[in-house]
Amino acid sequence: MAQHFSLAACDVVGFDLDHTLCCYNLPESARLIYNSFAQFLVKEKGYDKGLLTVTPEDWDFCCKGLALDLEDGNFIKLADNGTVLRASHGTKMLSAEALAEEFGRKEWKHFMPDTGMAFRSGKYYFYDNYFDLPGALLCARVVDSLTKQNNGQKPFDFWKDIVAGIQHNYKMSAFKENCGIYFPEIKRDPGKYLHTCPESVKKWLRQLKNAGKILMLITSSHSDYCRLLCQYILGNDFEDLFDIVITNALKPGFFSHLPSQRPFRTLENDEEREALPFLDKPGWYSQGNAVHLYELLKKMTGKPEPKVVYFGDSMHSDIFPACHYSNWETVLILEELRGDKDGKPEESEPEEKKGKYEGSKAKPLNTSSKKWGSFFIDSVSGLENREDSLVYTWSCKRISAYSTIAIPSIEAIAELPLDYKFTRFSSNNSKTAGYYPNPPLVLSNAGKLTAK
């Protein structure tokens, strides 16, 4: 595999929408998402009213890369080899002694190397993006409440109520019906929750299109919500930017399902209509699958194997499936890179090659957590004073395994030439090679870590 990656070499450029092209005001959107679920649990399911009150300190619990064991109410931070680095019961962190007693040095009971372990199952749930994180705090506080009520009795059975809350607030008809709290509030005051795309990003999208690239938008958001977001962040003519728009894509199934399991559907007034046996032309569609999409891309490019790159923020929904099932190049939007503005590792890109990188912007909500430590590395419990006790997290391992490159935002690369050569993640390069503009400082400063 080539050591470098360039957008100029790609025929097709695809984008996720939420937290990729569309950037949210995270403190405000997090509160809104939390409240939409908490209100439902309290008013519809009879949960403790204390869930409705959240202090600023409570948000420190939120950290990407955690797994929730749905039966015992434990949140888990995994090392790259599947052992448990930190854990909490609800919001209560386990001590080193309790951690050793509960988990030892063995693999977490649900761990299977990479492709064998789904992000979501009936037994656990991984939190890997900023849309999910408020739910992690809510679930942890639910566990606290139920533990107090039931004297610690397990297993827990609250997940069905969380799923009901998702359905209530985000079902396909919720936007049109003004159902729940989330959509009505976004419609009422989009500027409170959404950031418009910088002019540099809009110009970059047009530059890609003018260079002959096919541009795609593939989002699991429904068409009506997608339209509201895109009109606000890109303008009313946003459809002119994209050759193909796919909403309600139901990722990751979009990439993993067979065409017969997930056909494309036409849309009429934001309502899904007939299932299509194949795609014969560009346009706006709902649901679908990567196989039929790729056949259309072959037709549009006139190439037997058009090269596709896909930008997304979720390892579960975007990066892993696009890489693993479709063999696309993948660009991970990793907000955690925005916090690294106070120093430059030795292997950082030369200043004159850098795109516009807004390091001075306010740090996103909880890119680091006092409770959970770094998203990228951690020390093995009980060995904190030993230099070689630092290990990669499971989340960090997956970044280098399934991402072509990782960037803090699209804006960070929007002013680079399209033929700019990014150093890619690969087995031949260091684990920090694919981070742009710099590797996370915590990785650069850690030296040689223990890789399991």
UniProtKB/Swiss-Prot annotation:
Residues 339-361 have a biased composition (Basic and acidic residues). Its EC number is 3.1.3.-. Residues 339-365 are annotated as: Disordered. It is an enzyme of class 3 (hydrolase). InterPro entries: HAD-like_sf (IPR036412), HAD-SF_hydro_IG_5-nucl (IPR008380), HAD_sf (IPR023214). The modification N6-acetyllysine is found at K171. The active site is at D16, D18. Mg(2+) binds at D16, D18, D313. GO terms for molecular function: 5'-nucleotidase activity; metal ion binding. Keywords: Acetylation, Hydrolase, Magnesium, Metal-binding. Belongs to the 5'(3')-deoxyribonucleotidase family. This is 5'-nucleotidase domain-containing protein 1. It comes from Bos taurus (Bovine). The gene is NT5DC1.
